[in-house]
Amino acid sequence: NRIDQLASQLTSNVRAANSTYPTSMREYEQRRDYQNNAIINCEQILKELQRIVEIFEVDVNTYGRYVNAIDREIGLIKKWRQRDNKIKAYLQGNV
């Protein structure tokens, strides 16, 4: 199903970003792209859950813990990107 596909893509993007330690700006940008795609996957999963609630008239509270977990994941990825700004500054020679 769609949520399963998106979750698989999310996992792949996080793993790809995590397996790359940037030593050049190109690698930094590639890692950033994976991180951004992971955030997009999270947003897509949230949208699919919302669609399920609307179409099947499911109690929205049924998915509350999943929504919270996905929101937490988005926050963690965003913090990760912020920490990577130090790598970017180093690669640009601004350290």
Report residues per predicted region.
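Amphipathic alpha-helical assembly/interaction segments
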Residues: N1-V95
